[in-house]
Amino acid sequence: MPLILLWFCFLCMIYVILKLEYTYVVKPFLKTAFLNTTSHYSDEYLREYSGIRWLHTFKEYREHTIFFNFPSFYCSPGSGIKHTLSELIKMEAERVNLTKTETIPKDILLERAKNYRVAQESNKSLLPQVEDLYEVSKWKRAISSLQKGEPSFVRTSEVAIGTMSGAGKMRIKVPVVKSYEEEVADMRLSQKVRAKADQIVVAAIEIVNDGFASVNSDVTLAASLYDKRHKTIASSFKGAYASRASGTPSHVVFYPTHRVAPGDNPNDTLELSAVSRDSDFDENFTLANFSVRTVYAKAKGPEVIRETQHLLNCKLEDLVKAQQFASDEQVVLALPRVYPKVNLDNYVMPGPDNVTKQEGEYSAKGIHFRKPIFNGSEIVLNATSKLPSSKSRGISKSEKIDDLGCMSDEEGIDYKYGQALMEEDVLEAQVDMFPLHNVAETMRLLFSGVSTIPMNVVEGTKISVAYLNELATHPGVHVPILNMLGRIPGSILARVHCEVAPTCGIGLAATYVEGNESAALGTDLGRLLGIQHVKWNPAIEPVKEFRFKPFSCVDWWNMHYLGSSKFSPVLAFVCLSKWINPPKGECKMSYALYFEPDIILPRQIASLNSVPSFMLRKELGTLSFKQGERRAYAFEVNFGKPQVEGKSVTLNFASAYCGLSQYMESDIVIDLTLMSSPMMGGTFTLAYVAGSYLKSIKNMQFLDALPHITFNFEKGGKSTRSLRFPSRLFPTYQSLDRWDLNASREDDVSGHFVLYQRDTVSSALEGDLVFRVSARVSGEPMMHGVSVGYPTTLTRATTGKMSSRSLGEKVRKPIGLAKGQAHMNLADYKRVFYPMAEWIYSSEKYEGRREDRDILKLLLKMRLDGTKATEDFRIVHSPLVRVLQNCAWLRGTIHFKIVVRANSEMMSYQRTSQVHVTAHENSLSSNEFFSGMLTATSGELEFSKEVVGPVEGFSSMGWNVQGNKKFYKLCIALGNVHEYEAVKVMASFGDDVEFAGQQKAGHYALERGVSVFKEFKY
């Protein structure tokens, strides 16, 4: 008996050993060998698909090829198909009705267009057990829990992650582990010690969504799972699925091959994006609840984990599908119409940064998927393209595409083509603007205020400032309606009331500047006065109206696009002078802003071949005439020169635009605004003198023989006198590109004006007669010639051309009284490149020595509108740069050129450096739209870019408009700074460039003040 028991135990042990060996050794080996051979496929099947590249297994290749070939159908006797394909084509041409059995079966079509994944409706979890995914026994799991360093495997219970409201959009984190506290690696430890911490390796994730829509509804939802650590959809995409939002909860399992490093929170790495397009749920209710279950392993690394063949197959299948769904290297699997459960035509899903849109072409031969299209932050789950014409596909008319049958519940052909979003019921917002018209002025009030004019004001003092970006916050009657409108027509009216005694006098101005930060402009009138402004004396005109165009490039404006708190357009009320005979008490000024929907001011848009005359205006300065004396002042009107007052130089839009040309032919209007008391009077004459400045005036009859205008200021009339000089009075074209700013240089002007008194100023009041002088262009100005202008530096002072300039090239002599060139054409601009920035090598600034062949890399960075650059990269203020800095809006093409000059002291065989030039859309961290490499010692690179903005194509240059990008950035990487001598950046405007409006003007100070007016007695 004991011997029998012993034999029985021996046989049991042998059975257990053989069982274990068969389960873990023999069976996996046979299964792998069987799957890696073709013996289980028929010979006919292999012959049909001979020559096809294998992808792990033949079955997977058939499911994941780029082009799905439909099998040719064999019509066996007695089958439902009674005609061959050629007979069907002939019958279709003869308009013979076909039954469903005589078309390509729908189930075969759907099989070939197999969707990425459709969730299964079930009340039970579909998540596999740990044993199905990892090769681990119960004994081994028990031992691993006792031993430190062994991998541990966890299957979590259901964890609620979030809800989707009736609005139909949701984006929420997907927790991988139940709790993360135990996974934290101590950051105080060394990197070598922290590397021994456990990683998280996720094997499977089950997403469960429980929809609460009515059972008889067809509300659907779709979701995508992605790794938020990646920036591109090709890398981050982990899977997508679709399901109903009603009835039984839906389950879907993904095998994401997801690993998380020690120290990183695994619950922050995955994100689920879900959307319900056809939801008719109220957004105050919950449409669906989402929960998750996971199977993951904790281990030092993946090499200590043994995955089952089932997990390997599932991971590979998910990987192939994800690549086909989301990679820009491959094509995209289209999600089919699953009728009637889920209708997913053109389903749009929010995704991470870069996502794709896929389209497929259905034909009798198969389904062909094109390259995916990147489309913002949306994924079109099912987009089937419209069949192209036979001409575009190169198919003759005889090769007619077979009818694929109907994929919906209706009869007939049903081709669907995808869009980013396609809705059946669209509610359109009302855009009727009837409340804006025929409304009383008091109902059109936007803003009102009261300010005091102090006794100690000086020239340039700002009395009051109204930022337009704050209009939406004021409690005006129509402000809520204006907040609702996309485009508000017309302009804005500013009305000012200021009552001053006629014995007093002061000059005021209301000015509107786009992109102006008033607090940083100081008291310089050249910067404060924009293209749109008006001047007056409240002692003469107690009420003044000023209409301005908020968007100078279009005929509308919007409450919500009026800049930010940093850069915004501003309406400012400015003093043109100090008080002249001030009042005894304080003086107040009240003003109000109204919107004018029926008054549309002309657009302020200039191009290279035309410019509105009202955009070219220039402040000349203030003149004072004492009582009992007679004086005369000579001054030049050169719109190409910047505005100068003392040491302050202002580069406004007029000087920047006119600096692009050599000469101008136009009428000139001189505006004189009386700023002293109207009870002071005098008679004045303004005459034009051709040639250089007069040295003295001995006889008034000499000036009376010249073209002149005699005027005085009327009592009770207007504050400003305007004097026009037609262009035919000027013997030569008006010079625009003069170098000298000082009026004392007598030989550098082609013509000038002389303002002199015919009588002396007399009044019972004390003080001087003071008025402000400005000039503007009238009529249709014509530009002649193209000029690259002169550089404007801090050394440009009273003596004209200074010896301290460091430009690299010799400055040409200014043209004297020569006649101008032929009329300017756009071809001239194509041949002229303007300097933008330059860098010159200096051995003291950089480490190493050129003689020792030291290597030092240098990056030169700048904004291509000439506003910012690295320290040694000097901005050159050419006319092109000044136009970019001073215009408020810009659109069109700009051509750029980078010229690199190598050091001539080094031999060619000693050079190893290269120059890499990149241009970026926004910041240097964004993708570059141009990348060029210069391998020669010296050379140049060229590229072009079209400037486009959100306001009818105009990009805002001086103020923040939501949705508008910053200007382009340039980065020049010098491989070895010691091998180069200089780098220059140049630019040229294209034919389609247009400028609009003026932002805050450029400004710099001189070392010594200059005089614009040359004074002499007579």
Swiss-Prot record:
Task: Give GO BP annotations, semicolon-separated.
Answer: transport of virus in host, cell to cell
Would the keyword Transport be found if you checked this record's keyword annotation? yes
Q: Which GO terms describe its cellular component?
A: host cell endoplasmic reticulum; host cell plasmodesma; T=3 icosahedral viral capsid
Among InterPro entries, the record links this protein to:
Como_LCP, RNA2_polyprotein, Viral_coat
Q: Name one Pfam family in it.
A: Como_LCP
| Keywords linked to the UniProt accession | Capsid protein, Host cell junction, Host endoplasmic reticulum, T=3 icosahedral capsid protein, Transport, Viral movement protein, Virion
Enumerate the residues marked as the site Cleavage: Q419, A420, Q821, A822
GO MF annotations, alphabetized: structural molecule activity
The protein depicted here goes by the name RNA2 polyprotein
Q: Which source organism?
A: Broad bean wilt virus 1 (strain Spinach/United States/ATCC PV-132/1963) (BBWV-1)
